[in-house]
């Protein structure tokens, strides 16, 4: 029953949709609303969200605006990149990885303020509704989850605008605001809707907000060195930085050199296909560099097992199962594999390309020049290969002698 909810924590951006939701919750549920606005690097000024919430009657003590950039990168982005996680071969999971953190903090604020409900602005067609709500139920299953898009009759843009106008909610589009449905954080920007709903329609060049076109990138390449400790980047060109600082700097470098644009059609967890365009400049560099440092610090068995586990791990994140036992189990295995992933990777950035120029590890290098040299060596006896090959061929030999044809 709607009257059973007394206080609701709303994931609030300050935009039109969540402002309408705020007013709708007050009107339909007759409840007190707590707004939570997370700074996860979306690059927008967040204080206007406070003014809008106040204008809609939210008490000052019920307005939470928090900088979660360091926590986002340290506890969510970096663990995911230790796994080299990619969904369906291309998507670096920029939206997927942000939702668990926002939902977790909502549940924590609910406990802090004595709220008995939570709400979000995700629509009934997308993956985000699943990601938010699975996180809510994992953290506090006693919270009432309110999803306006699955309840109200404001099912068109015209109805939403009429409701906003009726209730004095500002519907003025900010100058320079993209007409596309966008999601932005420190890892990526995504674009959906409008002409992108036709998968055969190329995106306009002025849609991209972050990365320059590779054609317009500098004609001179840039070489950087990324330092790694236990699988996480910790420095750029020898300068130690915090997780958020690392990603911010890699974003700047990647965007400048036209790195990180992506146009794909993905399979949503809810069953439909969706076309989206993404900009992930820093993440694109991190993925390539991390695989490079792993190539000399992980043994073959560990590296291959990680590659086998990665699609399942990526799917769990995409589908919203960040707080699931199976994701935590996989994370423990992945983190164990990173204990010796230490060293430096030299990377060249040039017109949309990330090229590995070198990789080194002072204490954890498994690349042995003594064993792999093409020159004469004294540590490897080629005759040992004879028995190795025969043992591996034994099943073929037996099958062939029994008349099996291959």
Swiss-Prot record:
Residue sites binding L-aspartate per the record: 123, 127-128
Gene3D superfamilies for this protein: Argininosuccinate synthetase, chain A, domain 2, HUPs, Single helix bin
Enzyme class: ligase
Top-level taxon: Bacteria
Ligand binding (ATP): 11-19, 38, 121
Listed CDD domains: ASS
Residues given in the record as L-citrulline binding sites: 91, 96, 127, 131, 181, 190, 266, 278
Catalytic reaction list: L-citrulline + L-aspartate + ATP = 2-(N(omega)-L-arginino)succinate + AMP + diphosphate + H(+)
Pathway this chain belongs to: Amino-acid biosynthesis; L-arginine biosynthesis; L-arginine from L-ornithine and carbamoyl phosphate: step 2/3
Subcellular location: Cytoplasm
Biological processes annotated in GO: argininosuccinate metabolic process; L-arginine biosynthetic process; urea cycle
GO CC, one annotated term: cytoplasm
Quaternary structure, from the entry: Homotetramer.
Similarity section: Belongs to the argininosuccinate synthase family. Type 1 subfamily.
NCBIfam families: argG (TIGR00032), PRK00509.1 (NF001770)
PANTHER family named in the record: ARGININOSUCCINATE SYNTHASE
Protein name: Argininosuccinate synthase
Protein species of origin: Campylobacter curvus (strain 525.92)
């Amino acid at each position: 029953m709607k009257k059973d909810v007394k206080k609701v924590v709303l994931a609030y951006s300050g935009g039109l949709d969540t402002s309408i939701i705020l007013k709708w919750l007050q009107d339909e549920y007759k409840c007190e609303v707590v707004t939570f606005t997370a700074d996860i690097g979306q690059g927008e000024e967040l204080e206007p969200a406070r003014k809008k919430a106040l204008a809609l009657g939210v008490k000052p003590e019920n307005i939470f605006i928090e900088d979660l950039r360091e926590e986002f990168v340290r506890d969510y982005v970096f663990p995911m990149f230790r796994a080299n996680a990619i969904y369906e071969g291309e998507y670096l999971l920029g939206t997927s990885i942000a939702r668990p953190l926002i939902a977790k903090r909502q549940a924590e604020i609910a406990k802090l303020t004595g709220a008995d409900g939570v709400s979000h602005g995700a629509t009934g067609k997308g993956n985000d509704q699943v990601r938010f709500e699975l996180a809510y139920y994992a953290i506090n299953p006693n919270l009432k989850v309110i999803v306006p898009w699955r309840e109200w009759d404001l099912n068109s843009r015209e109805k939403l605008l009429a409701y906003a106008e009726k209730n004095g909610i500002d519907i003025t589009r900010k100058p320079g605001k993209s007409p596309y449905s966008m999601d932005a954080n420190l890892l990526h920007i995504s674009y959906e809707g409008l002409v992108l709903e036709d998968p055969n329609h190329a995106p306009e060049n002025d849609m991209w907000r972050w990365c320059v076109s590779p054609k317009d990138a500098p004609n001179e390449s840039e070489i950087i060195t990324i330092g790694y400790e236990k699988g996480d980047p910790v420095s750029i060109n020898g300068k130690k930085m915090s997780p958020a600082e690392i990603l911010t700097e890699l974003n700047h470098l990647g965007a400048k050199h036209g790195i990180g644009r992506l146009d794909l059609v993905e399979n949503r967890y809810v069953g439909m296909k969706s076309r989206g365009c993404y900009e992930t400049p820093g993440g694109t560099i991190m993925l390539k560099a991390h695989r490079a440092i792993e190539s000399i610090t992980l043994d073959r068995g560990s590296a291959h097992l990680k590659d086998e586990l990665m699609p399942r791990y990526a799917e769990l994140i995409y589908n919203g199962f960040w707080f699931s036992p199976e994701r935590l189990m996989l994370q423990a295995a992945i983190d164990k594999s990173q204990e010796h992933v230490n060293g430096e990777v030299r990377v060249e950035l040039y017109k949309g390309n990330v090229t590995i120029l070198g990789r080194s590890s002072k204490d954890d290098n498994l690349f042995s020049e003594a064993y792999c040299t093409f020159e004469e060596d004294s540590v490897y006896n080629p005759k040992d290969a004879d028995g190795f090959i025969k043992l591996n061929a034994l099943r073929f030999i037996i099958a062939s002698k029994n008349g099996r044809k291959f």
